Amino acid sequence: MANTLDVANNLEQALRESDEFKSLKEAYEAVMGEPTAKQMFENFRDTQLSLQEKQMQGIEITEEEVEKARQVVETVQQHEGISKLMEEEQRLNNLINEISQIITKPLEDLYGTAEQN
């Protein structure tokens, strides 16, 4: 077990040292260093978190909330720095998803996939 946790800690360090994480951190710091971009990004994140909380609690999201979220997304996508930040976040998420597929391979091999059953 300790060896597995050591490998996980090494993976965490490798993620921090990856080009994907470094690019994300650089883009994040650029946005946080610009007051207007920072405010726009924080508004975007607050809107996102609010909708996620409602979904998790089973609360219906109104058309007005959907429209507001759409407008917020549209606005932040027009900001070059925030758009870059979102692209870099997606690149890191892609890497993490690939790692997740590798990590869960033993379970997939054990239980098989839905297509095999």
From Swiss-Prot:
Domain of life: Bacteria
InterPro entries: Com_YlbF (IPR010368), YheA/YmcA-like_dom_sf (IPR023378)
Name of the molecule in the record: UPF0342 protein OB1136
Sequence similarity: Belongs to the UPF0342 family.
Organism: Oceanobacillus iheyensis (strain DSM 14371 / CIP 107618 / JCM 11309 / KCTC 3954 / HTE831)
